[in-house]
Each structure stands twice: as structure tokens, then as C-alpha cells.
Regions:
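N-acyltransferase acceptor-side catalytic subdomain
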Residues: 1-131
Length: 131
């Protein structure tokens, strides 16, 4: 029987499956407890989503995504009224202001996702890409 891979996106850490931490043991930065704190302490311009990756009905991967809306930052473009600043502001607001990250934007390293060693990692990564 060919395994069926799927994903579920959770908007709150309180919605995460009970066995989430079984995979998060590799990094505290993906644990339910850490994600709950991250969710509560996130700045107003950032939203967190948590992705569960499933092989049939079994959780085989977990990931964190963050959406950052830089339009909400106060520090961009209020310095002066010259044409150069105006052009920069238009370009920034229309092309560079929405960022989707897989992982935590304040951490480096392997803290974006965890995949079970027992699963087909290529298929799980393809499923994460679809999410």
C-alpha cells in the first residue's frame, strides 16, 4: 500500500496534536511549550502557523512558518520627504513588505522543521512545499 502524505496547518499552538513533542524532542524550538510562548510574544506584524505533516494518519513531520508584514513597521520612510525616499517607500511597500519564512526568523540553524527518520523524507518535504 502506497502511503498518502498530507498536511494540516494550525493557527494556534493549543491546536497541535498530542504527539507533537514526540518529534520536537530534536529541538526545543519546535516544542509545543516554546511555540505557545512564541505565539503569545510575537510582534503585531508577525503571525505564526504550525504545520503537521502526516503519512496516512501518522504525524511524521512538524514545521513552523512565520508571516511578517513589514508594512506595519513604523521605522521605514518617515525620515524625509525627498523623491528618493518616496520611490524607495513605494518599491518597499509593493514588492518587499510581505515575507513568509519556514522556521523562526530570530534563530539560525536547523530549527525550521523536523521529519521522522522512519518516513520517506523526500515525500514529506514535497508535502511541506505544498503546505
Amino acid at each position: 500500500m502506497t502511503p498518502i502524505y498530507s498536511h494540516q496547518i494550525y493557527s494556534s499552538a493549543s491546536q497541535l496534536p498530542e504527539n507533537w513533542n514526540d518529534l520536537a524532542i530534536a529541538t526545543i524550538f519546535l516544542s509545543k511549550e516554546y511555540l505557545a510562548i512564541l505565539e503569545k510574544s510575537a510582534p503585531a506584524n508577525m503571525s505564526c502557523h504550525f504545520i503537521g505533516l502526516f503519512e496516512n494518519e501518522t504525524l511524521v513531520g512538524i514545521a513552523l512558518s512565520q508571516f511578517v508584514d513589514l508594512n506595519q513597521l513604523e521605522s521605514f520612510g518617515e525620515r524625509d520627504q525627498c523623491i528618493k525616499s518616496s520611490i524607495r517607500n513605494v518599491v518597499f511597500k509593493n514588492f518587499c513588505s510581505h515575507i513568509l519564512l519556514i522556521g523562526n526568523n530570530t534563530l539560525t540553524g536547523q530549527n525550521a522543521f523536523v521529519i521522522s527518520e522512519k518516513s520517506n523524507q523526500t515525500e514529506v518535504l514535497k508535502t511541506l512545499k505544498k503546505a
